[in-house]
């Protein structure tokens, strides 16, 4: 079908600029997102001491956020598809900045649980809107690379958070530190509102596909492909949530590392993973977009082996080296897991589709902190980290049944062979 005469056209340079500015801005927001999220793990020993919390209770502070964050994924994706990305990005950022600030005035376990749950509402509206914004402002051929760059900033935020938060806690205390990061969220929100480009025309970003095929939310919800990737993301995301939550406490309590050195040692794996997630997005787009299993399964098995070596390390340095290698290899696999739905879902329903996939990842966010806290209380840190080895191997097994190519990714009730 020929394009209408009034169909807008853009030069390649304009298309590239739209994608670059969009990804750059969203990377900044994701960094703040993860700093605000990870700082709770760094502050946990001090919050636990102030309020006399057990390890299980500390784990519930992370899980309260993660549970609400999970519940907001599908509604957040639906709202983004219905009302557009820009407005929802701003509402999300404003809400989570407010509740980050309110964390600093909490007076006990109950108030912390409520505030962190409401913080989860704010952050839970963000992922679907961010994927929607990327899909509207990129062409399908570069979408996994763009999404990989955006998601690499998760690990950048997770990496820099201990470097920023640990000194601030020492100088200002944990309460004032939450106020400082809340102010940073407001600042990046102003930049996002002023600088986010308009969406590309539908014939460039592919948002006319759903209209042509009559597909919508119902087809996404019934898609076995979407739910299989949600299960895969659940298994593999246990690693990130588990290590981010409990490694700082492990280094402080079991290895006797100072807070500043704990911050540095906790940052290194996240920064390496930031680079490998970005590289993984490029590798997937360039070489593996039609052979996802061949890419993901070996990487997950290598990750599991490195986690075993991490668990056996005799020194804190050895532990950090193997943790860094494990998270680096896991980072390479990330866009093999998320890149397929990012490439295959039409922009008009990508918010809903990625919301469902992200539900799987956030189930891991609910389970990992509290299960590992329970294992530490009842057994040891070794038992807790052993759980992550098992879930990583489980991810490799689930990868055997997910679609390998975009044309196998069905929005109907059956997958193509």
Role assignments for model-derived ranges:
Residues 73-84, 277-289, 376:
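Helix-to-loop junctions at the C-terminal end of transmembrane segments
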Residues 40-41, 224-278, 334, 338:
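Extracytoplasmic gate region of multi-pass secondary transporters
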Residues 7-15, 199-229:
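Juxtamembrane intracellular "pre-TM" segments in multi-pass secondary transporters
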Residues 115-154:
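Cytoplasmic helix-loop-helix junction between adjacent transmembrane helices
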Residues 150-197:
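Helix-loop-helix hairpin linking two adjacent transmembrane segments in secondary transporters
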Residues 290-337:
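C-terminal transmembrane helical hairpin of 12-TM major facilitator-type secondary transporters
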Residues 82-93, 285-300:
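Cytoplasmic membrane-interface "Motif A"-like loop-to-helix N-cap segments
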Residues 71-107:
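Conserved MFS/SLC helix-loop-helix module at the cytosolic interface between two early adjacent transmembrane helices
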């Amino acid at each position: 079908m020929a394009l209408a005469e009034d169909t807008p056209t853009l030069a390649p340079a304009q298309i590239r600029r739209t994608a670059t500015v969009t990804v750059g801005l969203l990377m900044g927001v994701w960094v703040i997102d993860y700093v605000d999220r990870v700082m709770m793990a760094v502050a946990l020993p001090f919050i636990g001491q102030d309020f006399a919390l057990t390890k299980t209770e500390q784990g519930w502070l992370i899980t309260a956020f993660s549970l609400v964050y999970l519940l907001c994924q599908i509604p957040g994706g639906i709202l983004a598809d219905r009302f557009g990305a820009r407005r929802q990005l701003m509402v999300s950022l404003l809400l989570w900045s407010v509740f980050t600030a309110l964390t600093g005035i909490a007076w006990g376990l109950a108030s912390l649980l409520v505030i962190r749950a409401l913080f989860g509402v704010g952050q839970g509206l963000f992922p679907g809107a961010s994927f929607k914004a990327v899909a509207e402002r990129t062409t399908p051929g570069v979408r996994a690379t763009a999404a990989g760059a955006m998601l690499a900033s998760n690990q950048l935020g997770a990496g820099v958070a201990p470097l920023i938060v640990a000194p601030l806690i020492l100088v200002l205390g944990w309460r004032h530190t939450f106020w400082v990061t809340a102010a940073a969220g407001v600042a990046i929100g102003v930049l996002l509102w002023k600088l986010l480009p308009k969406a590309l025309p539908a014939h460039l970003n592919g948002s006319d596909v759903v209209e042509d095929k009559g597909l919508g939310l119902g087809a996404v919800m019934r898609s076995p492909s979407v739910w299989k990737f949600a299960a895969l993301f659940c298994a593999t995301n246990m690693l990130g949530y588990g290590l981010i939550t409990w490694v700082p406490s492990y280094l402080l309590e079991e290895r006797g590392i100072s807070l500043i050195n704990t911050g540095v040692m906790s940052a290194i794996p996240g920064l390496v993973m930031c680079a490998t997630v970005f590289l993984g997005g490029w590798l997937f787009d360039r070489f593996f977009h039609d052979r996802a299993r061949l890419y993901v399964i070996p990487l997950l098995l290598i990750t599991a082996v490195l986690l075993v070596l991490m668990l056996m390390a005799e020194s804190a340095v050895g532990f950090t080296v193997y943790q860094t290698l494990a998270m680096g290899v896991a980072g390479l696999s990330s866009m093999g897991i998320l890149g397929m739905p990012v490439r295959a879902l039409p922009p008009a329903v990508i918010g809903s589709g990625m919301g469902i996939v992200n539900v799987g990842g956030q189930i891991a966010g609910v389970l990992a902190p509290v299960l590992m806290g329970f294992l530490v209380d009842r057994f040891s840190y070794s038992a807790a980290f052993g759980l992550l080895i098992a879930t990583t191997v489980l991810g490799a097994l689930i990868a055997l049944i997910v679609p390998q190519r975009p044309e196998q990714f069905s929005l109907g009730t059956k997958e193509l062979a």
